[in-house]
């Protein structure tokens, strides 16, 4: 028996077919044993639901559009070394957009949330980010993750049953007015970039900071055009509504807002994250570009999370919502990716059809990626 196929009851099975049939059995066993998502009743999901969820994941490429999985929290500078691939395989998650945080060296957390602890020195964040890209390269190679540089790469990884990552950067503070640095990180394998984060930069205003630019700067507009030219998914998470509205006027390709929730979300309930939620109008302008809004996983339960997805779908439509957990930043419902299939299963318990679940779980991001990256 080689690594690509095996015989069973006189039939030839591909590696991918064998993987999915094994996954159905293992997920059903986990459900029977009471294994579930944080704060959920996933153990109550039936083997039939698990099988239906896996069918969705087999027929569509699933994506977490924003994660820090494999790393060590937003303010830690330790190298990323967690076995991200193990959880992805167990939960049948195909793609993770693995976000590095270039402004990490100057961030701190307190009761008010995430703040900057000072002003970076010239070149400090640029040097730090390049070092982090080295670490991510080492981690992905060590754990057998594919690096996806194109939509064809994502499709090939899914067809083979191999987990893959999209290189992602959360905040372009390291550019320091130099567009050539954007081209350099593209050459290093990054395909998804977020304009702003928690540190003031020369691109635009961010939600939790003081407004200094009244939206997008002229350099920010240049950055968006360069993203389109080079082939990046352009992510406007953390940006103020005025910044996003200005970005929409510049953009000629779909924009992504990777991790948030609807402002005043009944499903999410009281939260210290109100400054990062978005209004209905904010969400709609993203959808108007053909883009999508990702919902983070900071909900009380899996059921409430899927309600949060439905809230956003009711505002922007089924083609404009995706999953962006922001995993490894704060506790949430997807503590590790072995539970991903439970999340898809919950989508199928009355809120969404299999086709709709496939769009949210990855199809909508894939549409954006194909257009933006190729």
Residue ranges and their predicted role:
Residues 66, 150, 189, 234, ...:
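Conserved, mostly hydrophobic/aromatic
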Residues 87-180, 208-212, 218-219, 225-226:
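A metal-dependent hydrolase metal-coordination microenvironment
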């Amino acid at each position: 028996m080689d690594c690509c196929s095996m015989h069973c009851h006189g039939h030839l099975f591909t590696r991918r077919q064998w993987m999915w049939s094994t996954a159905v059995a293992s997920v059903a066993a986990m459900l029977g044993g009471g294994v579930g998502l944080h704060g959920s009743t996933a153990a109550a999901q039936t083997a039939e639901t698990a099988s239906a969820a896996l069918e969705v994941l087999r027929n569509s490429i699933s994506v977490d559009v924003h994660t820090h999985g494999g790393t060590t929290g937003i303010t830690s500078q330790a190298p990323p070394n967690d076995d991200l691939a193990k959880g992805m395989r167990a939960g049948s998650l195909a793609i993770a957009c693995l976000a590095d945080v270039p402004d990490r060296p100057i961030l701190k957390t307190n009761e008010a949330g995430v703040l900057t602890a000072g002003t970076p020195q010239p070149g400090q964040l640029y040097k730090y980010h390049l070092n982090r890209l080295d670490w991510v390269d080492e981690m992905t190679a060590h754990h057998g993750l594919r690096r996806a540089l194109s939509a064809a790469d994502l499709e090939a990884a899914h067809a083979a049953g191999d987990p893959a990552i999209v290189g992602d950067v959360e905040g372009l503070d390291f550019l320091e007015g130099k567009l050539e640095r954007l081209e350099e990180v593209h050459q290093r394998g990054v395909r998804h970039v977020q304009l702003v984060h928690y540190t003031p930069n020369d691109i635009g205003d961010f939600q939790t900071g003081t407004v200094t630019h009244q939206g997008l700067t002229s350099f920010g507009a240049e950055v968006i055009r360069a993203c389109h030219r080079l082939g990046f998914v352009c992510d406007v998470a953390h940006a103020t509504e005025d910044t996003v509205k200005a970005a929409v006027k510049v953009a000629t390709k779909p924009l992504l807002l990777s991790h948030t929730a609807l402002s005043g979300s009944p499903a999410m309930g009281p939260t210290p994250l109100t400054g990062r939620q978005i209004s209905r109008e904010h969400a709609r302008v993203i959808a108007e570009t053909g883009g999508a809004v990702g919902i983070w996983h900071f909900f009380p339960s899996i059921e409430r999370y899927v309600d949060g997805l439905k809230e956003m779908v009711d505002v922007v439509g089924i083609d404009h919502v995706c999953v962006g957990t922001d995993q490894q930043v704060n506790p949430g419902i997807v503590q590790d990716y072995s539970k991903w299939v439970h999340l898809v299963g919950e989508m199928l318990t009355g809120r969404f059809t299999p086709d709709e679940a496939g769009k949210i779980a990855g199809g909508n991001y894939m549409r954006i990626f194909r257009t933006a990256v190729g």
